[in-house]
Amino acid sequence: MRTGLIAKKLGMTRLFKEDGTHVPVTVLHLDNVEVVDARTNERDGYTAIQLGLGNAKVKNVTKANRGHFARTKVEPKRHLAEFRVSEDALLEAGTKLSAAHFVVGQKVDVTGQSKGKGFAGVMKRHNFAGLEASHGVSISHRSHGSTGQRQDPGKVFKGKKMAGHMGDERVTTLNLEIAAVDEERNLIMVRGAIPGAKNGLVLIRDAIKKARHADAPYPAATVAAAG
């Protein structure tokens, strides 16, 4: 199992194929993605890689993280993310990763923070049908109906679908296809939409329900190797 990548969502566009058909894609930017630290079985009890995205000013970094970056001798990063990997896929701190880490046609899983929708009713939030339009129903047309039972059990069960805050939660979309890769500009174009707003952070991994692409570099595609 190899590492994923942390990227910034730039927005959506479309790519034209040779036959004239077009494909909607989401453009992701790898802003100086670098290995910050590695977790080992001897020290941490598991194996993983910590990646950093975008450079940060030292004054904006917490004192604890300053020490962390100083220990690994890596320039301070604006965002951090950790990926579980196999022991043979560990990378040294300071290794810069390239967009060539993923190849065209490969299936990936993309995780992001969905857009917040505010307080929403059950018809929008849970796709409820609502109550009757007439036949004695007034004012309550978009309500959820019964909340529970009666004196027994005398409570509302946890997880009951009701009105409440919608969106702004961690969402993973599975089996998206890599439509194009631009190594020079460090761009990855994923077919279709992915969770989150523009400039939001996303995590890209090899699809967990699909076999890894035969041409995908292992353990990773570094900037030096890609160049």
From Swiss-Prot:
PTM characteristics: Methylated by PrmB.
Coiled-coil ranges from the UniProt annotation: none
GO cellular component, one term: cytosolic large ribosomal subunit
InterPro entries: Ribosomal_uL3, Ribosomal_uL3_bac/org-type, Ribosomal_uL3_CS, Transl_B-barrel_sf
Alphabetical list of Pfam families matching this protein: Ribosomal_L3 (PF00297)
Membrane-spanning intervals of the chain: none
One Gene Ontology term of the molecular function aspect: structural constituent of ribosome
Keywords carried by this UniProt record: Methylation, Ribonucleoprotein, Ribosomal protein, RNA-binding, rRNA-binding
Annotated HAMAP family: Ribosomal_uL3_B (MF_01325_B)
PANTHER family the UniProt entry points to: 50S RIBOSOMAL PROTEIN L3, LARGE RIBOSOMAL SUBUNIT PROTEIN UL3C
Record's subunit section: Part of the 50S ribosomal subunit. Forms a cluster with proteins L14 and L19.
Protein task: One of the primary rRNA binding proteins, it binds directly near the 3'-end of the 23S rRNA, where it nucleates assembly of the 50S subunit.
Name of this protein: Large ribosomal subunit protein uL3
Native source organism of the sequence: Gluconobacter oxydans (strain 621H)
Classification lineage: Bacteria, Pseudomonadati, Pseudomonadota, Alphaproteobacteria, Acetobacterales
